[in-house]
Amino acid sequence: MRLNRVGITGGAIYLALGLLWVWLASPPGPAWLLVAWFAAVALVEAFIPGEANQVSFARAHLAAPAFVYSVSPGHLGLLAVVLAVAGLSDLVDGTIARRFHRPSTLGGGLDPVVDGVLLGGVAIGLALGGIFPLWLAVVIVARYLLPAIGGLVLIYLHRRPELRHTLSGQISTALIIILVGGICLFRFMNQDATNVVVGAEVVIPITTLATFVHLGWVARRPVTTPEPG
């Protein structure tokens, strides 16, 4: 892969916004770690083509403030806002890809990676703060980690994994964002979040299992020639 103008531009914009957030918000924790995260993501982004993929990278950058707010109980309202923005970016990147007829295998592989980084970090942070059940955080991490491991196994077996969006995966991610964001919002407003937590404990494992079954079924089928990009 080589440097890409769209990727460099997108990474520079996100890096500037990240540095501005660190300066204005003075978030808890070492500032240099946050700056290093934004810089590292921007560096990777510089090699990734496509406008839709740049929108997807917003979620990788948002992982830093999301994790910081998830381990700070007084910032759960801001975490809910970050998750709402992340969910919006998930809608926008797909819309851009379809609008300009540029869906790609790269985008199909990138989305679950950035979603896993964002939502896995949030789930772990909330579990560490006692806001979220630890076992459910493990389920969310596994939701994104196990398919990635499965893809690596297929590559090791000299099979090309089919990188594309699946309906079950999109529904699973959307519900995780909605339910986790809802828990944060209820706790921030000092409202009883028991029903939302119970809903998450039922819905997230079911949709995760459905995603695994769907991905396993897709992996059994012959791989068609992927689109470039």
Where are these predicted regions, by residue range?
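Membrane-embedded alpha-helical segments that form the functional core of polytopic membrane enzymes
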Residues: W32-W37, A42, Q54, A60-L106, ...
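A feature for the membrane-embedded catalytic helix bundles of lipid/isoprenoid biosynthetic enzymes
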Residues: M1-N53, V113-G229
